[in-house]
Amino acid sequence: MEEGEAKKTGLEGTGLSLPGSSHGNLRSAGSDQQLKQMLDSLKSSKSPAVINYGASWCRVCSQILPPFCRFSNEFKNLTFIYADIDECPETTQNIRYTPTFHFYRDGEKVDEMLGTGEERLHDRLWLHS
């Protein structure tokens, strides 16, 4: 890393070429503070959301991340959040498996999906959208 260059975190920190969200509903938490703010916002907004807890070193996480980003364009009413467990150690200390997906509705966690599978994730997103 060049001196003076900011460390890339969240989705940028993965180093993957990822599709962006044309609807602005894809967010990335690069710190515990950011993730806490996003969780507080979810609780007050009551809009449906999914959080993808992953890690930059997790091969399976890297495989599901491009579809996760793509799905943010398909499911416009869901808020999509990516949180790297190494960048958010306090708020993710209960995450024991990567990737883990948490689904929120009306400010409450209503579902959890461990592991991956593009079709499985798509079906779960459809269910909660």
Swiss-Prot record:
Upper taxonomic lineage: Eukaryota, Viridiplantae, Streptophyta, Embryophyta, Tracheophyta
Catalytic center residues: 58 (nucleophile), 61 (nucleophile)
Family: Belongs to the thioredoxin family.
Biological role: Probable thiol-disulfide oxidoreductase that may participate in various redox reactions.
Pfam families membership: Thioredoxin
Region (Disordered): 1-30
Basic and acidic residues composition-biased segments: 1-10
Keyword annotations of the record: Disulfide bond, Electron transport, Redox-active center, Transport
Bias kind Polar residues: ranges: 19-30
Thioredoxin domain: residues covered: 7-129
Name listed for the protein in its UniProt record: Thioredoxin-like 3-3
Disulfide bonds: 58-61
